[in-house]
Amino acid sequence: GGSSRKSLVASRVSLDAAVKGADANSASALSSELFFVADVLSTNIAVRRALTDPSRDGKAKAAFISELFGKKVGGVALGLVTELSSLRWSAPKDLVLVLEQLAIEAEASAANIAGELDRVEDEIFTAAAAFASSTDLRKALTSDATNAKATLVADILKGASGSTVKLVS
């Protein structure tokens, strides 16, 4: 919806400010932390609703976020998540989708800072082509066997950039 689109735009501005001047490792760490928060929110509807409820006080949300994630993510990620919780969302799941998008963009920024963005783009394209051309690969990737999927992706991406592995996984 319209609220989530506006919030996505505001979120990207905040992410750009967060990665401006950062080194590749810091941008990649931010990506990992945003993926972590998105994963927690994707599996916990109550937390997701608490963070997207427009009737909840911003200070209460910030305290909740700090309590929940303060020891698990860095200050930059904590600040971004707090800021995102203050925005309007058309649906609670939109916050998760935007967090995942920001995590991808942070990892792309890390690759760009490291001078590897073209390589990462090529590797992702090659991996996507491999997945698209193989029914067996697609079946393996859609199975519930997480360890088997991780091993398969690692085998396919052997020698690939760390950013590529993170983004494809």
Q: Where are the language model's segments positioned?
A:
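Elongated, mostly alpha-helical coiled-coil "stalk/stator" tethers of large membrane protein machines
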Residues: 1-169
